[in-house]
Regions:
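A short hydrophobic/small-residue beta-strand
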Residues: 22, 104-105, 111
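Conserved strand-to-helix beginnings and helix N-cap segments that scaffold or border functional pockets
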Residues: 9, 60, 95, 117-118
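Conserved anion-binding
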Residues: 1-82
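Short Gly/Pro-enriched loop/turn and capping motifs at secondary-structure junctions
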Residues: 51-53, 88-91, 111-112
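Catalytic cores of alpha/beta
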Residues: 30-42, 87-105
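C-terminal helical cap(s) of enzyme catalytic domains, especially alpha/beta-barrels
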Residues: 98, 110-127
Length: 127
């Protein structure tokens, strides 16, 4: 959303015209209300739970509250936009995000640096 704040609607329309699904992302400092107008318009909202740029960062603890707010608004609007979370996802933070309403998780460092990656996937899938 931050990349094209003044032309988001045009970009969404162009992506749709190309026959593709549309997702938008928000950084940790962006108020979640900024994505509310796009619920039901885009297919996915990616909530960044770290500052974008590099892997291995610590999960920002306010992320579940942000997810819950988007989820509540999604329910209020009766739409099915997916909520995805990326950044600092592991076997502790992933379940918090799922409990808050996330549909998808992106697990990078915690998965690829694990002694048993399959065990990490199993824990995340079980929540």
């Amino acid at each position: 959303l931050e990349a094209v704040p003044d032309t988001a609607e045009e970009v969404i329309a162009a992506i749709r015209a190309a026959g593709c699904q549309v997702g938008i992302s928000i950084r940790p400092g962006t108020p979640v209300e900024a994505v509310f107008p796009y619920l039901g318009v885009v297919d996915l909202i990616l909530v960044m739970s770290v500052e974008p740029g590099f892997g291995g960062q610590k999960f920002i603890p306010t992320t579940p509250t942000r997810i819950a707010a988007i989820c509540a608004e999604r329910t209020r609007r009766g739409c099915d936009t997916l909520i995805e979370v990326d950044g600092g996802i592991n076997t502790e933070t992933g379940p918090l995000c799922i409990a808050a309403g996330a549909d998808w998780l992106v697990a990078g460092s915690s998965l690829f640096h694990a002694m048993d990656p399959a065990a990490v996937v199993n824990v995340l899938h079980s929540k």
